[in-house]
């Protein structure tokens, strides 16, 4: 995996990952990481990516890993950062794949970048905060409620929450915990404090971005879109996936009974195969 630092005109740096620099014969798939994670593409999918002809691209969102923080960032502004990344790499069109909050960033990018996006696959994506008809907090675990309600009260309140010493309990299901004993135990190498060497700005700004206007219209997504969600997800409950499916013109929803926030990734490889099928 090639890693580079992309210097932007505003002085910020984005830390970028590319599995096959300059290989235009592969389908570029941009990975959008979860909260809080590094942006390195998912190792558990590398083998499948090889036989599917995938070129993995990723980047640490601002405030994570080697990327400069950008307080006040939105889904749309991160989509603009993605544009700078793919332009710098010489990539014209590409597919998007995102997990958890990263799924929402993938959807935002698809809305902003339009025809450059060939397909989108998300796993446990979160719906917009102003989603009409959705009880946004319903079904969330207590730690998630506290964290996101702090973000909804403003960035200063979110900073106080994250620096108060409060512990986050994800309340993973048995199916989720079993995933850590297999290939997706990889998440432990990129999540949590490992993704925030310079402090919690990435986490703070992710959560704040979920509860403000996204700056893009999801109805403008033209790429075929796969939404995967587990019915037992207490971090981002499955009604978020249902709402997205009902409001995205090109979306297909796969609901998985009994799966939670991590265990839904058991279907990530089939999601990658779906992307390949959509793009030819």
Show which residues each predicted segment covers.
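Catalytic active-site module of serine/aspartate enzymes centered on a nucleophile-bearing elbow/loop
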Residues: 251-280
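Conserved acidic catalytic loop of the alpha/beta-hydrolase fold
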Residues: 77-95
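Conserved HGGG/HGGXW glycine-rich cap/lid loop of the alpha/beta-hydrolase fold
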Residues: 12-66
């Amino acid at each position: 995996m090639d890693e580079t630092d992309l210097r932007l005109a505003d002085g910020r740096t984005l830390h970028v990952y590319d599995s096959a620099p300059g290989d235009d014969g592969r389908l570029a798939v941009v990975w959008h990481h979860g909260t809080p994670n590094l942006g390195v593409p998912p190792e558990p999918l590398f083998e499948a990516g090889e036989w599917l002809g995938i070129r993995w691209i990723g980047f640490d969102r601002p405030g994570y890993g080697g990327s400069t923080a950008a307080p006040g960032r939105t889904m749309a502004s991160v989509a603009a950062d993605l544009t700078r990344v793919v332009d710098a790499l010489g990539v014209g069109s590409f597919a998007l794949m995102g997990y958890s909050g990263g799924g929402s960033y993938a959807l935002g990018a698809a809305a902003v970048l339009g025809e450059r996006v060939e397909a989108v696959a998300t796993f446990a994506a979160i719906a917009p905060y102003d989603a009409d008809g959705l009880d946004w907090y319903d079904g969330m675990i207590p730690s998630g409620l506290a964290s996101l309600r702090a973000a909804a009260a403003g960035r200063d309140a979110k900073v106080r929450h994250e620096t108060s010493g409060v512990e986050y309990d994800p309340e993973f299901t048995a199916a989720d915990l079993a995933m850590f004993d297999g290939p997706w135990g990889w998440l432990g190498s990129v999540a949590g404090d490992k993704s925030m060497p310079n402090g919690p700005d990435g986490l703070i700004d992710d959560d704040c971005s979920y509860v403000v206007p996204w700056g893009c219209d999801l109805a403008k997504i033209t790429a075929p879109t796969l939404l995967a969600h587990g019915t037992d997800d207490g971090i981002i409950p499955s009604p978020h996936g249902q709402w997205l499916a009902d409001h995205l013109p090109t979306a297909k929803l796969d609901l998985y009974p009994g799966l939670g926030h991590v265990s839904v990734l058991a279907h990530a490889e089939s999601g990658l195969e779906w992307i390949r099928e959509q793009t030819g």
